Amino acid sequence: MKVVTLQVTKLEEVKRRAQDAFKGKKQGARISFATPELLFRLMTTKRWELIRALAGAGPLTIREVARRVDRDVKAVHGDVHTLLNAGVLQKTGDGLIVFPFDAIHVDAIHVDVLLHAA
């Protein structure tokens, strides 16, 4: 099963994984974010809908994806290109859109909140 992992991680961890990859250690597909806010900004409810519509469907046109989620083609076009730029979706040689994974795993997010006395 081909899984992509979305994670919030520090730059040092990304560098360590890159070094491990250069040494030949398998890393799996990962998309890393510097902050939880960046992850949440990318993975909106509407974009999750697009991924669900594309999962297992094979390559589709943006128009067909828009039809499947009952949304405006222009809005879907923008979301698709955002997901393409992030590496969540891919474009085939003939310009169709595909979700190239079987699943998405989102690593647990731990957020430290500093409380300040008023």
Regions found by a protein language model. Give the residues of each.
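A short, conserved structural fragment
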Residues: N85-D94
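Short, cationic-aromatic polyanion-contact patches
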Residues: F40-T44, T61, G93-A118
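A short acidic, leucine-rich amphipathic alpha-helix
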Residues: E64-R68
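Short amphipathic alpha-helical interaction segments
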Residues: R71-L84
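N-terminus-biased detector of the onset of the functional/mature region
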Residues: T5, S32, P59-L60
